[in-house]
Amino acid sequence: MTKVGLRIDVDAFRGTREGVPRLLEILSKHNIQASIFFSVGPDNMGRHLWRLVKPQFLWKMLRSNAASLYGWDILLAGTAWPGKEIGHANADIIREAAKHHEVGLHAWDHHAWQARSGNWDRQTMIDDIARGLRTLEEIIGQPVTCSAAAGWRADQKVIEAKEAFHLRYNSDCRGAIPFRPLLESGNPGTAQIPVTLPTWDEVIGRDVKAEDFNGWLLNRILRDKGTPVYTIHAEVEGCAYQHNFVDLLKRAAQEGVTFCPLSELLSETLPLGQVVRGNIAGREGWLGCQQIAGSR
């Protein structure tokens, strides 16, 4: 039996309003629990369009057929009009998710975090995280115990900033196994549970065809030598490609692969490491990457 952490990122208004209820129904039918990370502030995802001037981002949008993948409402959100606030407008959906699944913070403003947090000072970052946590806690009526940085935009500054909130774990980076990042003080910080597997949009049209994706992914899962963690998006697997996700769950069960919330992957003893800026194929710009202590 292979256990895989299932992380669901919710980036936009439509992903919350339409994608999450569909995913909740699918997961219930398959008796699966996951970790769902919500963006709760304004939906400004359309402001990423300026990145089309960057060849790598443009190619990603073209090969993944972004217009049909996400929909024009997501691709234009927050451009010609102010972005709609996601959290309180979809409070019932978020509360329903929290009844059955582990719920954490993805971002207050997903676009702002992904586009600008790398240049924020620590206090600006702390204030932004606090705003998101406060809003999510108001909605679900209980403490939030985990978070996942939008776009995996995380480095040492993010690690230090999140220590102020005493969360159980964060999932801010890409890597191989859960670990504790070393703080500037020399002490171990809050546990990190890295994502180990590629997302749909990172590989479709580059490494694999859409119709071959599930078999390709299951092969990666079964060959994973670390602690497999897979991320889906409410805007993708909860909308245009929900049928692919259902097929993945059926095929996974046949292969002896089970999915679980990320917290089930934690252990009492974890190795030490760091989160450093790096790059991965299929994703434009830098993101947080796991570096085990002592490695280079």
Swiss-Prot record:
<dbReference type="GO" id="GO:0009245">
    <property type="term" value="P:lipid A biosynthetic process"/>
</dbReference>
<feature type="domain" description="NodB homology">
    <location>
        <begin position="2"/>
        <end position="260"/>
    </location>
</feature>
<dbReference type="GO" id="GO:0016811">
    <property type="term" value="F:hydrolase activity, acting on carbon-nitrogen (but not peptide) bonds, in linear amides"/>
</dbReference>
<keyword id="KW-0444">Lipid biosynthesis</keyword>
<dbReference type="GO" id="GO:0046677">
    <property type="term" value="P:response to antibiotic"/>
</dbReference>
<comment type="function">
    <text>Catalyzes the deformylation of 4-deoxy-4-formamido-L-arabinose-phosphoundecaprenol to 4-amino-4-deoxy-L-arabinose-phosphoundecaprenol. The modified arabinose is attached to lipid A and is required for resistance to polymyxin and cationic antimicrobial peptides.</text>
</comment>
<dbReference type="InterPro" id="IPR023557">
    <property type="entry name" value="ArnD"/>
</dbReference>
<keyword id="KW-0046">Antibiotic resistance</keyword>
<dbReference type="InterPro" id="IPR002509">
    <property type="entry name" value="NODB_dom"/>
</dbReference>
<keyword id="KW-0443">Lipid metabolism</keyword>
<protein>
    <recommendedName>
        <fullName>Probable 4-deoxy-4-formamido-L-arabinose-phosphoundecaprenol deformylase ArnD</fullName>
        <ecNumber>3.5.1.n3</ecNumber>
    </recommendedName>
</protein>
<keyword id="KW-0448">Lipopolysaccharide biosynthesis</keyword>
<comment type="similarity">
    <text>Belongs to the polysaccharide deacetylase family. ArnD deformylase subfamily.</text>
</comment>
<dbReference type="GO" id="GO:0036108">
    <property type="term" value="P:4-amino-4-deoxy-alpha-L-arabinopyranosyl undecaprenyl phosphate biosynthetic process"/>
</dbReference>
<comment type="pathway">
    <text>Glycolipid biosynthesis; 4-amino-4-deoxy-alpha-L-arabinose undecaprenyl phosphate biosynthesis; 4-amino-4-deoxy-alpha-L-arabinose undecaprenyl phosphate from UDP-4-deoxy-4-formamido-beta-L-arabinose and undecaprenyl phosphate: step 2/2.</text>
</comment>
<dbReference type="GO" id="GO:0016020">
    <property type="term" value="C:membrane"/>
</dbReference>
<keyword id="KW-0441">Lipid A biosynthesis</keyword>
<dbReference type="InterPro" id="IPR050248">
    <property type="entry name" value="Polysacc_deacetylase_ArnD"/>
</dbReference>
<dbReference type="GO" id="GO:0009103">
    <property type="term" value="P:lipopolysaccharide biosynthetic process"/>
</dbReference>
<keyword id="KW-0378">Hydrolase</keyword>
<dbReference type="Pfam" id="PF01522">
    <property type="entry name" value="Polysacc_deac_1"/>
</dbReference>
<comment type="pathway">
    <text>Bacterial outer membrane biogenesis; lipopolysaccharide biosynthesis.</text>
</comment>
<dbReference type="InterPro" id="IPR011330">
    <property type="entry name" value="Glyco_hydro/deAcase_b/a-brl"/>
</dbReference>
